[in-house]
Amino acid sequence: MKGVKLLDAANKKVVTLLKQLKNKYPSEPNVKRLLKGYNAMVLHEILPFSDHVAYVKDKGDKLALCLQLEKYESKFIDINTLTFVILHEISHISSKSIGHTTEFRENFRFILDEAVKATIYEPKDYSKNPVRYCGMVIKHNPYFDINKKFDS
């Protein structure tokens, strides 16, 4: 049941963000793609034996997230870390390109910034305090790259 509650809480945060983005940036192409592509009905928990920790399929046809600190363990991650991960995944939906391109990184940073403004995410500098997520370590947060220009 905890997993369902975590996914629901993450979805509510995304919906809050989407409302803000729609009001502030209704004609921005990346926002339009995100508004069109995000669908809470396709949000799923990744099973522990999966090769993935999080992914979005076909720009929003499926969105899956691992909810544990470690694979094959029952301890769940905190909502702020899950929010960071889902914001990463919806940044793929907002991008035309596939993968971790310059466009994606710029969209991710934009989405993180807007999530902080919407008070749905508290930014953490993972370079100073890395966190465990589904057997991996998150060590970077583009939110703190304010003055950095991304290159391909």
Segment roles from a protein language model:
Residues 2-77, 97-152:
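Metalloprotease/metallohydrolase-associated module, dominated by Zn2+-dependent proteases
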Residues 81-96:
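Active-site recognition of the HExxH zinc-binding catalytic motif
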